[in-house]
């Protein structure tokens, strides 16, 4: 086998000092490439609930999950069976992994059957929210979501999906509780769960100016999400989760203090006179 090559960060000066706390080892054959290949543990193909699907690596973020000064990778696995919010149909299960840069799998979160898979649904944030030097993960969850240690959020027996193939709601989740959960970066253990703000109702209240278009009653507009991290008080980070891309947009800001998610404020453009009403956008920018 080819010997590994170790690379270190050094400080320039009269007496260079090697920073032995941060290093990266590459195979000799890889040292000339301008990137680091990180092996992933791809989930097995699934045949369940009448669905067959495989997984592919999707959105990713980085954060120092264990406080050692090095980044870890947090990766969303996208099933091949996904849907956009307006379309009926069942989806596969949405998974989120955490890896070290050498490919060690730290944990896997399974969001469960009550979180639909698709680009518009799961927005996850990775950031050190409480200032302890370790990043947390925050995302929307539901009954049956399972954390990185095997703990189940909510009621594991509940299946809130519409299972009638003839219904315009087929495969959609327009009933049941919705949650916002924060997970420990080192283990993937859920630290706190709160009721998601806002809820999805009324289903026909998200299109048109002020959400009064009454042009969608099947969750196509109610189930579109964005999210970001913002220093709202200029000192500590908050998370902002947004629901609605069209007529009505609701932004909910949360702080994570002493192990608890705490609502900071909620902005709602549901009034037609609101200048932010009807300002359709599929993205969130924070500056």
Task: Show where each model-derived region lies.
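Beta-propeller-forming repeat regions
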Residues: 2-6, 11-287
């Amino acid at each position: 086998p080819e010997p590994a090559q170790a690379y270190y960060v050094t400080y320039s000066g009269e007496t260079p000092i090697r920073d032995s706390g941060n290093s990266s080892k590459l195979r000799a054959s890889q040292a000339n490439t301008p990137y680091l290949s990180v092996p992933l543990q791809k989930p097995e193909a699934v045949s369940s609930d009448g669905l067959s699907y495989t997984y592919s690596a999707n959105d990713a973020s980085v954060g120092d999950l264990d406080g050692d000064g090095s980044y870890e990778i947090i990766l969303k696995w996208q099933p091949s069976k996904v849907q956009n919010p307006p379309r009926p149909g069942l989806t596969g299960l949405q998974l989120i992994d955490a890896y070290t840069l050498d490919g060690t799998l730290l944990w896997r979160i399974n969001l469960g059957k009550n979180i639909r898979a698709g680009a518009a649904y799961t927005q996850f944030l990775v950031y050190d929210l409480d200032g302890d030097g370790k990043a947390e993960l925050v995302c929307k969850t539901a009954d049956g979501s399972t954390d990185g240690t095997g703990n189940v959020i909510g009621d594991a027996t509940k299946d809130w999906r519409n299972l009638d193939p003839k219904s315009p709601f087929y495969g959609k989740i327009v009933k049941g509780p919705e949650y916002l959960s924060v997970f420990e970066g080192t283990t993937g253990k859920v630290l706190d769960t709160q009721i998601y703000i806002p809820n999805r109702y009324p289903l026909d209240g998200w299109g048109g100016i002020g959400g009064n278009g009454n042009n969608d009653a099947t969750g196509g507009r109610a189930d579109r999400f964005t999210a970001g991290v913002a220093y709202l008080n200029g000192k500590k980070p908050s998370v902002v989760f947004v629901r609605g891309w069209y007529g009505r947009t609701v932004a909910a800001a949360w702080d994570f203090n002493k192990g608890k998610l705490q609502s900071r404020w909620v902005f709602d453009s549901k009034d037609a006179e609101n200048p932010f009403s009807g300002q359709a956008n599929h993205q969130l920018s924070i500056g």
